[in-house]
Amino acid sequence: MSSPSDFASEESTAAAPVGIFDSGLGGLSVLRALRAQLPEESFVYVADSRHAPYGERDDAFIIERTLAIGEWLAARGTKALVVACNTATAQSIAVVREKLAIPLVGVEPGIKPATLASRSRVAGVLATAATLRSARFESLIERYAADCRFLRQPGHGLVETIERGDTSSPALRALLAGYLEPMLAAGADTLVLGCTHYPFLDMTIRELTQARLTLIDTSEAIARQLARVLDEHGLHVPTGTAARPPHLYSTDDGSRLQALAAALLGGGFKVEVQQKPVAPEWHLPRQ
């Protein structure tokens, strides 16, 4: 078993992998988009599932966790970091950007594309409480909302439910209906999925709303932004380099990450989790 201590050993910085971090499993939706748009790149994914959801945590905790995991990834040679968590981006990316020497890409609720998509000029935003209360979110509303009214709905309970692997149970559908029906009653025709976990609810939302809401998911936009950042810093992988399978790490036992990654990443991709951590709270995959 090789050591995971340095992803970039014996290779150029450009050939090193990109780090991806989320509070849990939601960032796998971003990883899927990144692999589709940048198939030659390699990726290292960290799910902080032991501490999910971040949306109910205070700002200091979110900053501490994001910085700790970002430093862990940077120290092991990742060439860039995608903070694939709306809550972590909203509350901590400015601090983390100052501390880390590698380029960062964050995720934000798709307020601008929702404004462009909405014909009724009423749109819903489903996000964590921490995202909705953040100054970064308010800035997006001020910059892009224009004449469009945004209905803000904290998605209490959704991340925990998705982390358990539930995306369509009767209880989940009832919870979602309670969030979505007031939006429809208010005339919303567009819904911003303001958490990277929520794209896993895409089909259930469409069924509950009879496809009356245009869903805004920013995963593909994140992939385009990462491509631009790698270009700007001369960090695109050298031509002819074969992408390696993603390395996946979890702060819980990794079983849910393994199951969901195998289903989402396709091609028979398998995640193996080693139960013996080499540092506090970390469970590492076999390599």
Question: What residue spans do the PLM features occupy?
Answer:
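Non-catalytic structural scaffold of enzyme domains
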Residues: S2-Q287
